[in-house]
Amino acid sequence: MDAASSSLALSNIKLHGSTNTLNSDQRISSLCSLPKSRVTFSCKTSGNLQVRDRSTGLVVSCSSSNGDRDVIQGLHLSGPIEKKSRLGQACCSVGTFTVGEFALESQSQAVDDKVGVLLLNLGGPETLDDVQPFLYNLFADPDIIRLPRLFRFLQEPLAKLISTYRAPKSKEGYASIGGGSPLRKITDEQAQALKMALAEKNMSTNVYVGMRYWYPFTEEAIQQIKRDGITRLVVLPLYPQYSISTTGSSIRVLQKMFREDAYLSSLPVSIIKSWYQREGYIKSMADLMQAELKNFANPQEVMIFFSAHGVPVSYVENAGDPYKDQMEECICLIMQELKARGIGNEHTLAYQSRVGPVQWLKPYTDEVLVELGQKGIKSLLAVPVSFVSEHIETLEEIDMEYKHLALESGIQNWGRVPALNCNSSFISDLADAVIEALPSATALAPHTSSTDADDHDPFLYAIKLLFGSVLAFILLLSPKAFMVFRNNFLLNYTRIYGYRGERSEFFWVRLIFT
């Protein structure tokens, strides 16, 4: 967009700390070239400015001839807004929209937006008593256990059955890391750090935390957002790479809530679905890895071992989950950054946390560790690349189980890169991501699913829940009945659908009954 087509008449502009007041025909191109100052102004658009709601304000962004880009922060531009001058000739555009001819009024017409940021995460049990209900919430998610449509009425009863069965072993894991997950505490700290980072960038926000499977649930965060009167929302899942089982599941919950609420359905929302490509994230990961490599006697001989959370192959091949491609690209970007710093270590990627008898993304972390030991690798640096917070999969699975396996397999020197947590450069980059996402905020697109549609019929839902609960109760109390049901269920399912180990539905059937 050239300077002529992007110019914007402004009125009621005052430079703080200066006696100068700009004329009403002052152009944005002049504003961008101003020295560092604090600017407030108000405006109202008319004409053919292509925005969804002409009553909304504008976010002005400036780009310079050297390729840099910056944003005059704030919505409705009622400031105060800090803008640092850039080197090179500057031209401007308004948000991500096309600008034509439009007028501005001298009186203030815009109302400040109240910006909210919603951080989404998995959640985790904070005490051992929380483990079983947490697991129930996890397995009751249809994006985790993808039952065939014919058997969806079993979702909640089977979640109860599986969570009861798995709780004792899971409790052992949480007991080994202090009796509960630190995920909520760390995520709360990240939220506070992000709020401060945004404030330093002259963006006043409320930051909320919404967990998918434990407190504070996403539903609780949304209710607080409504009470606070938020007028523009950025949703930031704390998963660098997108998967239908993480970010996808959380977005599905949001879509359902927004569809059923008049206030929420009109709330402008921007969702950052993935952010693994961001330069700040890549550099932050490289910083941590570079620091850990220095702890080895011979850093150049260390094998860099990326361990990512796995998903069933069927998610990728049948459901179109981009997780595998995004993960591989993420690893490539991190290694490119390290290479630019003169670090050329060998590296490999493996996937952890698989369960059940069917194929997950390969190679598997435990198998690769054994192979590396057999090949004579003596030094290894584990990098948990799916996680930005410490939790059971880093503190127990990697630090205990995989470390023990690695040392047992012949690896002598073990190191592990810490999760990003509240790393300052990482948090600053998340703040930039939020600011960049604001101009694209629109009402959340409606989405319907057959599962949600069934839930709207209370009579049908009650029948399904009753039947499934009775069946699960019988199976839980009677091992013989459980085995009979298992054998007949698998036999009939195979006859109907055929044995295709990559089918996500068949995977969960086998997972539940084997």
Swiss-Prot record:
The gene is HEMH. It catalyses: heme b + 2 H(+) = protoporphyrin IX + Fe(2+). PANTHER family: FERROCHELATASE, FERROCHELATASE-1, CHLOROPLASTIC_MITOCHONDRIAL. Keywords: Chloroplast, Heme biosynthesis, Iron, Lyase, Plastid, Porphyrin biosynthesis, Transit peptide. NCBIfam families: hemH. One of its GO terms (biological process) is heme biosynthetic process. Disulfide bonds: none annotated. InterPro entries: Ferrochelatase, Ferrochelatase_AS, Ferrochelatase_C, Ferrochelatase_N. This is Ferrochelatase-2, chloroplastic. Pfam families: Ferrochelatase (PF00762). It is an enzyme of class 4 (lyase). One of its GO terms (molecular function) is ferrochelatase activity. It is found in: Plastid, Chloroplast. Its main location: plastid. Its EC number is 4.98.1.1. Belongs to the ferrochelatase family. Pathway: Porphyrin-containing compound metabolism; protoheme biosynthesis; protoheme from protoporphyrin-IX: step 1/1.
